[in-house]
Amino acid sequence: MKPTTWNYEPQRPAFSRALMALGNTRKEIVVASADLSSSVGTHAFSQEFPERHYNFGIAEQNMISTCAGIASTGKVVFASSFAIFCTGRVYDQIRQSVCYPKLNVKIVATHAGITVGGDGATHQMIEDLALMRALPNMTVVVPADAPETEKAILAAADYEGPVYIRIGRANVPVCTTGKDCQDFEIGKATVMRDGDDVTLVGTGIMVAKCLEAAEELAKHQVSARVINLSTIKPLDERILIKAARETGCIVTAEEHSVVMGMGAAVALVLVENAHVPMKRVGIPDSFGESGEPDDLMAKYGLTVDNIVDGAHDVIKRRGR
């Protein structure tokens, strides 16, 4: 599907639909929230299955610890809150109570990144991927759009061990409807568009911007491969190494700090396996601020033009 024909949808209703599907078919599914059921997408589940939903109020640390206890009895628990609250505030509980015993707690973090807009720096979680991918036994997933969010939730329910799923607040382009995107598997990246001159690696809402950038580059006779890196940990190293060797240069794009985010994870793979020019498009080492989402994306360098410029830069450095 071309960028000009994309529909825009929020990801949280997709999370809600997936929870309802799981609730109707699997009695071991339990959901927890922290005073934000309507905002994060767990409200419908709480109404349909009140005996399997727990609202902990503004007590995220208690939520995660209790979810670990519930999971230790054989349940599969989905815990959800804003990304700022269910990562940094509860890091000790995630590490000690969830990851160390490798329990089936799935943390769905909403309102991630700077696209929460006016909520400002205190609510703009831009370092969560760095925190979560550092934890042993933690799997990290960042869906590109609503359809992929639904698939990711369903896949997480079947995946053994802790899973962190990051989604945003804003409406995002529905870009994963092509035939190559029908099958979703945790740990597997998807080639969204083939190309020979440069590889654009996107995650989350930046996948759509990578596809738009590829369209712009094509106008200048630059053939860009686009990879949707929906799983940040474990990385699909094979597809990244193959792309690096075949195109000779890579640009990564993420709505996250460049410090230890997806781009850093990709760089670690390349430095050991395929030395090619690389450019990371992401949020500089700084906090966010209040503003309209599009204005913030422009200020922090997360636009289609930034990706296009990055592509021209790595192609020039590659020297062919």
List PLM regions with ranges.
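Thiamine diphosphate
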Residues: M1-R166, N171, D183, ...
